[in-house]
């Protein structure tokens, strides 16, 4: 959390307005790269990233707003991106040059809007709720498939032990 505040400052930092990140040495770019690639860094900072308009819109629809939003310069006039930004009007978007966005992106081709979210708090589940427990599922793709399947079945609680792949990896 302290690292997040040191990099980003307040939620409406005026230095973000009308500026574009164009250099890979920018601390915000380094922070994003680490969130994308390092599970330990995500846990320590209690944050994770999503990439893409549809993931962000799904989070917004579920009443989960991001801490920060990064928008590639070429997508500033995209209708879907503008819709997401309107839904998150209190969050000042940070503009990335397309070159920087491409270098950060987990997509094989292209790039999209990136949002930084706080990790949800771990909580004790009531005894009567259905849940799925994962033990030693080490492939992130398999974890993602199981998470999507449980959601499709209406199961809202999934427990992963420490030997499982990180559920907040971009590969899930």
Range-by-range predicted roles:
Residues 78-89, 172:
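Short, aromatic/basic amphipathic alpha-helical patches
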């Amino acid at each position: 959390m302290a690292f997040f505040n040191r990099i980003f400052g307040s939620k409406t930092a005026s230095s973000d307005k009308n500026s574009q990140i164009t250099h890979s040495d920018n601390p915000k770019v380094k922070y994003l790269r680490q969130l994308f690639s390092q599970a330990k860094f995500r846990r320590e900072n209690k944050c994770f990233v999503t990439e893409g308009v549809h993931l962000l819109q799904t989070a917004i629809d579920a009443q989960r707003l991001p801490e920060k939003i990064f928008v590639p310069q070429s997508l500033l006039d995209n209708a879907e991106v503008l819709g997401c930004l309107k839904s998150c009007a209190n969050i000042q978007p940070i503009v990335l040059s397309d070159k920087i966005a491409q270098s950060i992106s987990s997509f094989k081709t292209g790039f999209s809007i990136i949002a930084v979210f706080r990790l949800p708090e771990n909580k004790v589940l009531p005894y009567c709720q259905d849940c799925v427990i994962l033990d030693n599922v080490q492939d992130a793709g398999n974890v993602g498939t199981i998470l999507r399947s449980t959601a499709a079945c209406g199961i809202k609680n999934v427990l992963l032990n420490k030997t499982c792949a990180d559920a907040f990896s971009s590969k899930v």
